[in-house]
Curated annotation (Swiss-Prot):
Alphabetical UniProt keywords: Apoptosis, Cardiotoxin, Cytolysis, Membrane, Myotoxin, Neurotoxin, Secreted, Target cell membrane, Target membrane, Toxin
SUBUNIT field: Monomer in solution; Homodimer and oligomer in the presence of negatively charged lipids forming a pore with a size ranging between 20 and 30 Angstroms.
Organism: Daboia russelii (Russel's viper)
Any one annotated GO CC term: membrane
GO BP annotations listed: apoptotic process; killing of cells of another organism
Predominant subcellular localization, coarse grouping: secreted
Record protein name field: Cytotoxin drCT-1
Length: 20
């Protein structure tokens, strides 16, 4: 899944540093 801070579910799948 692509990093997407607009979607909490996707946001949680983002590695640290990739959640910007």
């Amino acid at each position: 899944l692509k990093c997407n801070k607009l979607v909490p579910l996707f946001y949680k799948t983002c590695p640290a540093g990739k959640n910007l």
